[in-house]
Amino acid sequence: MPKQDKEQYLINNLGSKYVGDDAAVVGDTLYSMDAFFEDTHFKREWMSIAQIGRKAMLINISDAIAMNAQPKFALITVSLPHDVTEDQIDELMTSMDNTAKEYGCEIIGGDTIGGDKLHLSITIVSQSDTPLLRTGLKEGDLLAYTGVLGGSKRDLDALYRGEKIADDSRFFDPTLRADFVAKARPLLRTGMDISDGLFCDTNKMLDINKYGFHEFEKVDDEIGLSGEEFEMLVSFAPEHYSDVMQIAEETNTPLTVYAKVAKNDDRYTCKSHHF
């Protein structure tokens, strides 16, 4: 069974009404958790300890941002290999703590275990009165993505070839669109962050809403199959196009409208981006 099918099979078996978004919404509180595992999401020889800590925190905060929520608290589980030094542990925790504070989030506890590899799992508790969900699409809605996609996959391929990439690479340090999401929220119908690639995440949104799409122009595989971008995939009604684009300009957020929602079964061909 392909990775995406196994993931959906597990989710379906949970049987909870709270499952299906970037975070579980319980009242005005949102709960989310993401793993960041060595040799699945990163290789230690590719990144400094500080970069590992920062990205682990960013990809978790991204779930809150994607749902128009304010991150409040973080709980961290870390599996520490025997070769990690105390100085490296300090560097890891300082990086995560500083990154969390950038978004108004406080680390309040967690757990540590010994292991063969460096694994991190972070739970974020956030709050929102108007969460942005994946559900709610309507026929004719426009589908758009923020940022310039493709850089994460391009740099990942370079790392595989043994090349160096820039310290500010999206693969190391993704950009979260908190200002855009907060200001555009009244006009947005649905949203999610792009973690598995534009193609796969578009399919997820269409599947949960039982719609298809019409593409305005072909999206290249280099863009659509680039995972771990952590940009936003959003939808909105056509009549809000000008206002949404104005907010994108005001928040310095590149925004590309690439498709519209339709009553068909069309889907992108996609695959997992993990190793």
Feature locations, PLM:
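Helix-biased detector of long, well-ordered alpha-helical tracts
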Residues: M1-F275
